[in-house]
Amino acid sequence: MAKTIYIAGLGLIGASMALGIKRDHPDYEILGYNRSQASRDIALERGMIDRATDDFASFAPLADVIILTLPIKQTIAFIKELADLDLKEGVIISDAGSTKSAIVDVAEQYLAGKSVRFVGAHPMAGSHKTGAASADVNLFENAYYIFTPSSLTSPDTLEEMKDLLSGLHARFIEIDAKEHDRVTSQISHFPHILASGLMEQTAVYAQEHEMARRFAAGGFRDMTRIAESEPGMWTSILLSNRETILDRIADFKERLDEVGQAISKGDEEQIWNFFNQARAQRQAMEIHKRGGVDSSYDLYVDVPDEEDVILRILELLRGTSLVNIHINEENREDVHGILQISFKNAQDLERAERLITENTDYTVVIK
């Protein structure tokens, strides 16, 4: 039986989700909300949605499933608004927020006693690109799609959502909302604070030591890439998870103090252990085998300074899920190769390594 799906928010996540739903459920009607006329037009022209509006309340009563792919504050406001609307009996309401406790708490407060079902969710996928124009049906492939069930979630609700989103090819997992926020504070939210703090510190330092900007490359670039993230979104994330974030900051201060004291005392063994333990722990995490935000698989190639060499490599890699290519111009010991190529999945990474190794004499390193 065909359903009507209402996606509120036609940015990268919402528009990509619409494409994924249509892939497995072409008979479903997908309605879209967005304040931006441009985003609505793109989604309609490219067949991501069937109808669009800038009036959130207008389509809500028509939907069998409502998915809020919006900033956290707006998601909370719309949940409160949905509580006062005449919705279909048994409608499923879900979201895509990066923090869950605040959203789930509001849903349980405002939707309790209504003939609706709610399940919090967080698709851990993203890109450096934004907006409906960058929508990608494969955005969620192999990434974790986290559900945070609550008192408003029944077992059949989860099964219906998994069926609806089957075309995303994501990896569904269920976790308590509070535990979700604790985990993501450490592996997602706090790293953004570190990256932005390091970037700001370097900018101030470079005012007196101007060569710092010129020499910043390799490891520095890797550590600060996420400092380019959208400020409004991250302000909202931190303020909706403030207690856990503050715990992470306090814990990290202690670790900095410990290594600082070791340096001050000249404790070579403690310093060595600091780096060695971190190296061993990172290797044990098998980060590339996990779905997650901006998950990618990187390959480095030492290529000669010859005409068309990059074009030759790209020809070899035709048909792979190449998502980014970067030329490392700096001659630094922490740069594995001149050409850095990122792939969406491990299969294409392995295929690329084999193709380049078999057809060239270039040195290839997988990071």
Predicted regions and their residues:
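A conserved regulatory-domain signal marking ACT and ACT-like small-molecule sensing domains
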Residues: 281-367
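Rossmann-like NAD(P)(H) cofactor-binding subdomain of soluble oxidoreductases
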Residues: 81-132
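NAD(P)+-binding Rossmann beta1-loop-alpha1 motif at the extreme N-terminus of oxidoreductases
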Residues: 1-61
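Rossmann-like NAD(P)-binding element
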Residues: 57-86, 91-92, 98
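Internal alpha-helical scaffold of NAD(P)-dependent oxidoreductase catalytic cores
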Residues: 139-226
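Small-residue-rich helix-loop
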Residues: 267-285, 289
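Interdomain hinge/lid region at the active-site interface
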Residues: 208-275
